[in-house]
Swiss-Prot record:
Keywords: Cell outer membrane, Lipoprotein, Membrane, Palmitate, Signal. Part of the Bam complex, which is composed of the outer membrane protein BamA, and four lipoproteins BamB, BamC, BamD and BamE. This is Outer membrane protein assembly factor BamC. GO terms for cellular component: cell outer membrane. Residues 211-230 are annotated as: Disordered.
Length: 348
């Protein structure tokens, strides 16, 4: 009986210790950004000048392997933040990123699609309940109030204020985010790496919301687009491609179902670059008959489908795993196949 009681006490103590350990882990998030390992290197003594006994004759000195003295001002040990930098995301069609210590920018093609970008940004901030402390409609600039970032890797959440602006120049529209202050609790943060991290976080919030709006608008347009006209064409180098007489957003949203209906399974797609990865396995003769077209001679396998934005039209180019586009004959066959597939997907 004594042994059983002792075992029970040990199990209770072990269970209590586990609860305390898990509670500590759940409240202290520093382990997510700190080095986990041996820190004895921090106790390495500094280099000293070699003491030479009197009367000893030394070989000629060669400074090739001298270790230069250096003063390190960076963080070490537990103070070193091992988290990778945040990646700014180019989520919008035709967008690219320009990142610096001062600001994070989303660069867009100056097309009609982004003609209302400023009003979309203002609407998005309101939707996310981000308060605006100052706004200049004419200059298309604003300053947000303090925004709190609740993150699992910070014990005390950061708060940031941001300058947000939209500008047009020549062929380019720019959405820019820069810091107007960053703090953690009551402590002002001036570390450039932290400021850049939270600039990128804010830009990604805006890009993500705008991308969702773009996707929803494209889906609504696709519902009303009806049958699409498809024809054969060629790119600037003379290689065969397919031209669809519909805007990029419409074609992009209609493609998944159309491709599936002709035996092409979409394995990956990236809207901002217009890239779609597909695996072609063909269809049965009865399926092709139901679609109203003859079976194309395109070989089964993996293809990259590159979708191009030609304003009120879109281009499609299939590229094989070996980097070769379709032949003119194969391309012409796919024109008929896709036109039939798009006509079947008008209500999707």
């Amino acid at each position: 009986m004594a042994t059983l009681l002792q075992t029970s006490k040990v199990m209770k103590v072990a269970g209590l210790s586990l609860v305390v350990f898990l509670a500590a882990c759940s409240s202290d998030q520093r382990y997510k950004r700190q080095v986990n390992g041996d820190e004895s290197y921090l106790e390495t003594p500094p280099l000293k000048t070699l003491n030479i006994p009197g009367g000893m004759i030394l070989p000629l000195q060669n400074g090739e392997y001298d270790v230069p003295s250096a003063t390190s001002t960076g963080a070490v040990g537990k103070e070193l933040d091992i988290r990778p930098p945040l990646q700014a995301l180019a989520l919008l069609t035709g967008s690219r990123i320009e990142n610096s210590a001062q600001s994070s920018k989303l660069l867009l093609e100056n097309t009609s699609e982004y003609s209302k970008l400023w009003s979309q940004v203002v609407s998005l901030l309101a939707k996310k309940n981000y308060q605006i402390s100052q706004k200049d409609e004419a200059a298309q600039t604003l300053t947000t109030d303090w925004i709190t970032w609740q993150r699992a890797d910070e014990n005390v959440p950061y708060q940031g204020r941001y300058h947000v602006s939209v500008s047009q120049q020549d062929y380019q529209t720019t959405l820019s985010v820069s810091s107007d202050g960053l703090k953690q609790g009551e402590q002002d943060i001036t570390d450039p790496a932290a400021i850049q991290r939270y600039n990128v976080l804010m830009l990604n919030e805006l890009a993500g919301g705008l991308s969702q709006q773009q996707e929803e608008a494209g889906q609504n347009n696709a519902k009303d687009s009806g049958a699409l006209t498809v024809q054969s064409g060629s790119d600037n180098t003379g290689l065969a491609q397919i031209i669809v007489r519909a805007p990029y957003n419409v074609v992009w949203n209609r493609l998944p179902y159309a491709l599936e209906s002709i035996g092409m399974q979409v394995t990956d797609r990236t809207r901002s670059t217009g890239s779609i990865a597909v695996t072609y396995k063909g269809r049965s003769s009865s399926d092709w008959k139901a679609l109203g077209v003859e079976e194309p001679s395109v070989r089964e396998g993996n293809y990259k489908l590159q979708v191009g934005d030609l304003d009120n039209r879109s281009s499609l180019q299939f590229i094989s795993e070996k980097g070769k586009p379709l032949t003119q004959s194969e391309n012409d066959q796919m024109v008929a196949v896709l036109e039939a597939a798009f006509s079947k997907s008008t209500d999707k």
